[in-house]
Amino acid sequence: MPLTHYTVGYHDAQQEHHEICEYAKDSYDAIQHAKEDILYLKEHPSFIDYCTN
């Protein structure tokens, strides 16, 4: 299965918006990759706002 580009949007404790781009086979994997890349998201998964491609 080819990888697709996803944008994962999230906010921090100060309500500042951030985005990270990931290549993954689906949106679930993109979110999991984002959690691996940004440890803050692993601790606070509810701060993830969206995942689009």
Language-model regions, residue ranges each:
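Intrinsically disordered/low-complexity terminal segments and short unstructured peptides
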Residues: 3-6, 26, 51
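Short aromatic-glycine-(Arg/Gly/Cys) micro-motifs in beta-strand/loop hairpins
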Residues: 1-18
